[in-house]
């Protein structure tokens, strides 16, 4: 089956790559908690209108932190289910399960590979 939208594409420009090379080639490189990363977090936070943001090493880590925060916010709530698509990565589901939530699977929409809205509404 040929899909209308590709799952991935390269959207990095030469300028982006030059900046990454400059950062990685720095003699005192610290990838996750450096001055540059802190500056970027502050600029990012201002740009999206929030007080704080935290950058992590991967989407898997980001998902885990998000679910951990949701667990804290959801502490006294009865519902502990998270709706997730059937087309996903194992790390997405692991972040749900590792934080004590129950994944509720929903079929995808084959035209754009997102969760099927009608199926999501049925699960709520």
Label every model-predicted segment.
Residues 8-13, 68, 114-121:
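Short, composition-biased local secondary-structure segments
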Residues 7-10, 52, 110:
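Short, flexible active-site loop motifs that bind/organize anionic cofactors or intermediates
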Residues 30-31, 35, 39-81, 95, ...:
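Phosphate-binding glycine-rich loop
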Residues 1-30:
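N-terminal "arm"/small-domain region of PLP-dependent enzymes with the aminotransferase-like
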Residues 72-124:
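PLP-dependent aminotransferase-like
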